[in-house]
Amino acid sequence: APLVMGVVLILGFLLLIALRDKHGQSTLARTATRFGWANTRARRKNIYRSGPLGRADWGTMQLPGLAAASRLVEYKDSYNRPFAMIHVPSTGDFTIVIGSEPDGSSLVDREQVDIWVAEWGMWLANVADEPGLEAVSVTIETAPDTGLRLQRMIQNGIVDDAPQFAKELLTEIQGSYPSGAAVVRAYIALTFNAAARSGGRKRSADEMGRELASRVPGLTLGLSSTGAGAVHPLSAQELCEVIRVAYDPAAAVLIDEANAAGEPPELYWPEVGPTAHQATWDSYRHDSATSVTWMMSTAPRGNVPSSILARLLAPHRDIARKRVTLLYRPIDAARAAAIVEADVRNATFNLSSADRPSARSIASTRAAVATAAEEASGAGLVNFGMLITATVTDRSREQDARAAIDNLSATARLRVRLVHGSQDSAFAAALPLGLVLPKHLQVPAEVRGQL
C-alpha cells in the first residue's frame, strides 16, 4: 500500500507539471500562484498606506513594493546635461532613463522606416556589449494632452503687431486642439550591474555615476538615428514627474500648469509614490486611478512587419493612459551559441520524428536554423517580454479598457494574459524604473521555467 501510494503521488505530481494551459503555464504553477495570493491577502501585503497617516514610521510617500528601497541621485554627463540614476541596493543595479517623443511613421517613406528598424537592431546589438549591462526596457506611454504646452507655445509666438485674423485663428486653435488630443512619449531604461563582470568588484553609486556620465552621450547619440526623435537623459525632476503622474494621473494637470507658469514643482524621490494602493487578483487601485496589467505569453509567429504594434501603441478612447513596455535581457555570447544550437536540435528532432510534419514544425525548424546562422555571423541574442498596462480614472470604464486591450493584442498577433496575483509588481515593472524581475523572485527563474 505505501508503494502504491507513493507511485500515485509521483504520477499526480508529474500530471500537475505536464498539464498546461494555452499560455504554457502548468497546473502546478497556477496552484502555487493561488496559494501565494492567499498568503499575501492573509498578511494584508496587498494594501499600502503612506504619508503622515500611513503605516510607515517616516511618514513619506515612498514607492511601494519592488521599488521601495530604490534611491535616486543626479549627475551630469559629458555634455553637462543632468541625468537621473536609480540605485536598487538589494540587487546592486543602477538605471538611467532616456526620454524621447517619437514622430511615428505617418507620411514617412518605407525606405526610411526600414532604415529606422535596421538602426534599432544595431543599437540593441551594440548596447548588449556595454560592460555591466543587465537589461533594457522601452516604455511607450499614451496619455491625454492637457494642451498647456501648446498654449504656452502659442502665447510666446504671438507678437503685438500681428494681424487680427491670425490672432483669432491661433486663439481658436488654442481652445479646440486639446480636446481629444493625446501625447505619446517613449522612455528607454538601461540597467547596469555594480560589477562590470561576473565576480568582479562592486562599484559604489558615485563610481557608477562618474562612469555612466561618460557613456550617456554615446547611448543617446545612437538612439537619434532609430526614429526616436529628439532624445535626452531624464533629469531627477523629470523622472519624479513621470513616476508621480503614473501613480496619480490627476496630478498631471497640476504639474503641467506649474511647468507652464515657469514654476516647476519640487518633487523628491521619497514623495512620488501613491498615498494608498490596493492590489486585487486581477487589478490594481492606486490613488486616483485603477490599472490592469497584462503580460505577453506568446510572441507573434511568422513574418513580423514593422507596423505590427501600431494599433496597440496608438492612443485609444477607452483607455485614459496606456503603457506598453518591451523588456530586453541580453544573453552573453557563450550562452547564446549553446541556446541556438539546442533549439536547432530540438526543432530537427520534432520534424524528423513525425511521419507527416506540420507546417508549423517546418517553419519552426527553418526559423531555428536561420537564428543559428545569424548568431554564428555575429548577431546578438536577447530574451524579451512585454507588459501592457491600461489605466482608467473612472472605474466604470474598466471593462471597456479590458475589452480594448483584448482586441488590440489580437491585431498585433500577441497572446497575452492577465498578471494574476501580482498586479502591483507588474505595474511597477512596466514603469521606466529598470527593475530586473528575475532578481526579485523568491523561486529561481530556472526552476519556475521548468514548472
Protein language model regions, located:
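Extended, folded cores of ATP/NTP-driven motor/assembly subunits in large transport
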Residues: P2-L451
